[in-house]
Design a protein with these regions (language model features):
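Serine-esterase "nucleophile elbow" of acetyl-processing enzymes
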Residues: 11-74, 88-101
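Alpha-helical cap/lid subdomain in secreted, periplasmic
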Residues: 58, 86-189
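Acidic/histidine-rich helix-loop elements
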Residues: 46-51, 71-85, 111-118
């Protein structure tokens, strides 16, 4: 993780364009502004190279200074590997009551096979850990179903490649009374 700029105690700023220019910059700590912690995989992570991009790196553009975003996502992560890599634990150390945790998993979880794996087994168990830990810190969990893959059938329509994972998340959101953003349905064309 040391190769990643977002995994240390430093603030990393990036200025883009043909002639980036900054005349002044003021950085002030604001503990009274809620933070949205983003947990997920490559569809959420701050992508390093263009033309790649994710909703996680774009979403802050739609909000003002009254909310902060902290993107803890990492390419290749599943819900259980995110926990095992201590990415959730790190986010929890920064979390305060009133914050939010948006979690989108399913792409890499769906690829895991074997005993105890599956949408209604290890996937839901891991998501329940996110929900419980988030609530224990006084923050608000929000489940986000996995965005559709760019996979089209012969008829030109999106192929559903996530199997039961979106349904498992929808079921868990209803059972645990957790808000759900159904990105899976929103990205179906």
């Amino acid at each position: 993780e040391k190769r990643k700029l977002n995994w240390d105690d430093k603030l990393t700023l990036e200025f883009n364009g043909k002639s980036p220019c900054v005349s002044e910059l003021t950085i002030e700590r604001t503990d009274n502004v809620p933070t949205v912690f983003l947990c997920g995989n490559s569809t959420v992570v701050d992508q390093d190279n263009e033309p790649w991009g994710s909703w996680g790196q774009m979403i802050p553009r739609f909000f003002n200074e009254n909310i902060c975003f902290a993107n803890y996502a990492e390419s290749g992560e599943s819900a259980n590997t995110f926990i095992a890599a201590k990415r959730l634990k790190k986010a929890l150390t920064q979390m305060k009551p009133g914050d939010y945790v948006f979690m989108e998993f399913g792409h890499n979880d769906q690829k895991q096979k074997g005993p105890g794996k599956g949408a209604f087994y290890s996937y839901m168990t891991s998501l329940k850990t996110f929900i419980d830990e988030t609530r224990a810190h006084g923050a608000h969990p929000v489940l986000v179903t996995p965005t559709q893959r760019h996979s089209f059938g012969a008829d030109g329509k999106i192929q559903d490649t996530h199997e039961d994972y979106p349904d498992a998340m929808r079921w868990l959101a209803a059972k645990e009374n957790v808000p759900l953003i159904d990105l899976n349905e929103m990205t179906r064309t």
